[in-house]
Amino acid sequence: MYRNHIQRLPGDPHSIIPLSSPLPRQTRFFSRCPMTTTQQAFLTILRASLHQEEATPALTADQWPELFRLAESHKVLPMIFEAVFPQVRQADPALAMSAKAQVRNRVILQTMRTAEFLELFQALTDAGASPLVVKGIVCRQLYPKPDHRPSSDEDILIPPEEFALCHSVMTRLGLRTTEADPDKVYEVPYRRPSSPLYIELHKHLFPPESGAYGDLNRFFADAAQRTVELTVQGHRIRTLGHTDHLLYLLLHAYKHFLHSGFGIRQICDILLFSHAHAGQIEWGHIRKCCKAVRADKFAAAVFTIGVRHLGFGPVGPWTNVDELPLLEDVLSAGVYGSADDDRLHSSTITLEAVSAQKQGRGTHSGLLTAAFPSAQALEGRYPWLKGRHWLLPAAWGDRIFSYLRENRSPGSGSAALKLGAERRALLKYYGILK
C-alpha cells in the first residue's frame, strides 16, 4: 500500500498538520550527523507511550509543531499527543486544543473502522469463506490504547479460489472497488461510500509478478494450515500463526524499504508483536527466511532500534548491528516512504537494483532504466498499472512530466537520482545488495 488515506468527520475543520507540509530534509546516512532535538524527543516520547511511562521533553515553542508534523508523517500523532498533552497545553494552549480536536477525530474514525471491519469479517466467515486478518487490527491490539494506533485500511488474505465469494459478500454489504479487472490482480481495494472503512483483499501477500520481492510468497505457501484465533471486542477472528505473522511484518517492512522506505510505526508493530509472542515464535525459521532473501542484517537493525531507542529488551537470535543508518532513513521516510516526491521517485532505482541482482544482471542500473522503469517498479505509484502493463508508456510520460514540473529550480533535477543512489548504497550497507 502506498496511498495516504486521510479522512475527516463531516465538517471537521481541524488540521494542524497538513499533509502538504514537508518534513525538514534529513542529512543522508553517510553523514553520521546526530539526530535533531525534535527527533530525539520524538523517539523518547514514543518510547514512553509504548511502555506507558511519563514523558517530559524540553522543547521550544517552535519545536512543538515540528514534533507533531513528524508524528503525523509516521501516523502516530494520537500516541505522541496523549503522552505530552500537559506539556504542550502549557507551552502553547492554542496548538494543544487544535491538536486535541484532530486527535479526537482520528480516534473516532478508527473506532468506526474497527467496528465496521469486525462486522464485515463476521459476514465473510458466515458465508463460508476462510479469511485471515493480517497486520492492522492484530497489531493494534498490542498497543496500550489500540485506537490510538490508526490503520488507514485493513488487510484480509484469502485463498484465490474464494475471491468470487468474498467479492459477492463485500459488494452486498455496500463496499465497492475501483479495480477494473479484479480477477487479474493480487490485491483488490474496497471502500464503502460515506464510511471510513477501507479494505485491501489479498489473494497473495506480495505481488507475484514483482521481480524484487514476488518470491517472498513462497514462505507463506502453507500458512493457512498454521493459523491462530484471536478475540477482538467479542468477535473471533483468524490470523496467521505467530511465526508466519512476524515473518510477514518483517518482510512487509523490507518490501517498503526496497521501495522508498518505511516508518517507525512498522518498527513498533514488529517489536510489540515479537515480544508479545516471543515464546511461540520459531526464531530459527525467521532468521533462515530473512537470510534467504538477504534481509537478516535488516531485521537485526530493526530489533537493535528497539533495544537502543525504544526501550525493548533483546529478543530472538539477532546480533547487534549498526542501526543508525536505518533509523535515520526511517525517520526521514514517513509512514510508507512518502515524505517527499524525490523519495517516491527514487524507488525505481532501488527496485531495479534488487531485481537485477535476483536476475543475475548488474545492480548499477543506468539512467535509461531510471527514466523508463518496469511496470512492476511503478505499480506502487501508479496502481492502475496492476494487470494493465500495456499502459506503461502512459506512466512513463506522466512520470517525466512530473519531473519537469517539479524540478524547475536550478540543480533540483537530479535530487531523486541522487537519493536513489544513496538508498542503493544503504541497501548494500545492510547486505541486501552485494
Q: Would you name each region that the model predicts?
A:
Residues 34-152, 158-434:
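Conserved NTP-donor binding/palm subdomain of two-metal-ion nucleotidyltransferases/polymerases, i.e.
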Residues 1-31, 97:
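Low-complexity proline/serine/threonine-rich segments in eukaryotic and viral proteins
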